[in-house]
Amino acid sequence: MSLRTVVVIAVVLLAGCREVRVNTLAQGTTTVLGGDQILVVRDDDDLTRLGIHAPVHFRREFGVILLMGPHNRSGYKQIVESIRANDQRVRVVAFEQEPADGGEPSPSYRTYTLWIVPNKVYRKGIRVDVVTPSDSPIATTFLP
């Protein structure tokens, strides 16, 4: 099952089985430093502060961003194994894959995964947990 399919299933569960389409899924890096975080973004200023540029239409969509790092060697990437959701919680299982060749020295950066989700599935107070495959916590947030 592809990552996009898993995201669509999670969003459908959040929406109470209504038909929902995830518009975009993006991965990349940002030089805005910090630790591991899961964030909900509701406007362009939030994205700009994170150094992320994406075509989010905030009148009808919101973004959820998983940030991991920082790293000082090139080549790290995020792997999202699964996303499960119910009416109270979303659980994301993810980790970062180190570069096979050890990477090259680089300025510090963080990796990110951005999900763009329709506003109609937004539910204030939903808990979003990100854990490793061994169930160690990475980050938690609540939809504000």
Question: In which residue ranges do the predicted regions lie?
Answer:
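Bacterial N-terminal signal peptides that target proteins for export
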Residues: 1-7
